[in-house]
Design a protein with these regions (language model features):
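N-terminal cap/lid segment of alpha/beta-hydrolase-fold proteins
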Residues: 1-23
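Alpha/beta-hydrolase-fold enzymes
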Residues: 110-193, 322-336
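Catalytic active-site module of serine/aspartate enzymes centered on a nucleophile-bearing elbow/loop
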Residues: 249-301
Length: 411
């Protein structure tokens, strides 16, 4: 079937470009969604459809925000969180526009795209059939000593700025045709913004450390001779995965462009088998209804509830922290409310929402402002904004359909 070029709208109204190839046999039930490497675009991923050779799947591949034909400054995005939300918007668009349910979708992602997808699997817990991750860029090899620390310092001083990729095509693949197309492709951008590069590290560390929360059937392909990303975080991610169905394949001699390597048929044999097996069986989901009683969640809760000896560094830190909160409550209104009613009380929540620093003196106001700007409270306020937007969106759709709008506030 002929490839089509289309656009979909994200939650913030940005129109992102994507390629769509209908199933060759005319079926409309299943889809494979492709996510490209950093710096690249969908045009360099659609060959995967040809190599897989599945006629009963539709294929979709996007140009991530700031890449290819999609808008935005090249190599940039408002945040990693925005790009992950874009992934969710894309899958939702496929469901609403083409009627393909998430449970009939397989996701294939490479490098930076694999980090976005793994973060999406972790944060959004989508009910997709399976995922294939090829050489996820959980930790990029920065060969300059202290490069990451230096970038953090420079970002605080300069704000967001861009760095160019050092990676040459011959470090990505042994395949001469892929090398030449990489060098000649005008849509490839060498630059990446520092906020995205650093955000990539932070998201990857979070997902790798908490990979047990991911239960999607998953196949991990690791390039054995990767010049671009480290191996250890990929193995840590796999070892911690909560998926009951998971596979790891280490491909000796492969460079970073796993799916575009000279001997990529080795990888595609495993991918074809894995995808067919998943779609030949009913969707399998891990039962987490007892996770609060046993398993990783219970273990983590028990560890957090374990008292810390004051004589240890962590114990001393938190004892000092609690004492500081109590002392600060003499001058800070927010800390006073938290101490008297609890930091998880409705009174505290109302105060955080108002976001107006108050105190008994100028010092107290300064402490209160610092308290209200804590990352947790900023997240709470953003959650309120998101809930409001979700209610507005749902209400608008109901009105368009001529249905009544009823809102129930469960508190």
């Amino acid at each position: 079937m002929q490839e089509q070029q289309k656009h979909f709208a994200t939650q913030d109204g940005t129109e992102l470009f994507y390629r769509y190839r209908p199933a060759a046999d005319g079926s409309t039930e299943k889809a494979i969604v492709l996510f490209h490497r950093g710096h690249e675009h969908s045009g360099r991923m659609m060959f995967v459809a040809d190599e897989l050779g599945f006629d009963d799947f539709a294929y979709f591949a996007w140009d991530a925000r700031g890449h290819g034909h999609s808008p935005g400054e090249r190599g940039d995005s408002p945040s990693i969180g925005t790009s992950v939300a874009d992934v969710d918007d894309f899958i939702r668009h496929i469901q609403s526009e083409y009627g393909i349910k998430p449970e009939n979708i397989c996701v294939i992602a490479q490098s930076v795209g694999a980090v976005l997808v793994s973060t999406w699997l972790h944060d959004y817990a989508p009910k997709i059939r399976c995922a294939v991750l090829a050489s996820p860029a959980f930790k990029v090899k920065l060969y300059v000593p202290f490069a990451r620390t230096g970038l953090k310092i420079m970002q605080k001083w300069r704000g967001n700025f861009f760095v160019n990729s050092y990676v040459k095509s011959h470090y990505l693949t042994h395949n001469k045709e892929r090398q030449d197309s990489f060098n000649q492709d005008p849509l490839i951008t060498r630059a990446i913004s520092v906020r995205i590069l650093l955000g990539l590290y932070e998201a990857a560390e979070r997902v790798v450390s908490d990979a047990q929360a991911i239960t999607t059937p998953l196949q991990l392909l690791i390039s054995g001779s990767d010049w671009v990303v480290h191996h250890k975080p990929q193995h840590d991610f796999y070892n911690r995965l909560g998926s009951h169905i998971k596979e790891r394949h280490i491909l000796p001699g492969f460079y970073h462009d796993t799916l575009g390597e000279q001997n990529r048929e080795i990888a595609f044999v495993e991918m074809r088998r894995f995808i067919r097996e998943r779609f030949n069986q009913p969707l399998q989901q891990v039962d987490l209804t007892q996770a609060h009683l046993f398993g990783d969640s219970r273990r983590e809760a028990d560890e957090l509830a374990t008292p810390l000896p004051v004589c240890t560094p962590r114990g001393a830190f938190w004892a000092t922290y609690r004492a500081s909160l109590k002392l600060g409550s003499r001058w800070s209104e927010g800390l006073r409310i938290g101490q008297e009613t609890g930091f998880d009380s409705g009174s505290t929540l109302d105060y955080v929402y108002r976001n107006q620093p108050q105190g008994s003196n100028a010092f107290g106001v300064w402490v209160d402002k610092y308290y209200l700007n804590a990352i947790g409270w900023r997240g709470i306020r953003q959650r309120k904004v998101n809930i409001g937007k979700a209610i507005q969106t749902a209400s608008a759709k109901l009105r368009e359909a001529g249905k009544p709008v009823h809102v129930l506030d469960i508190a």
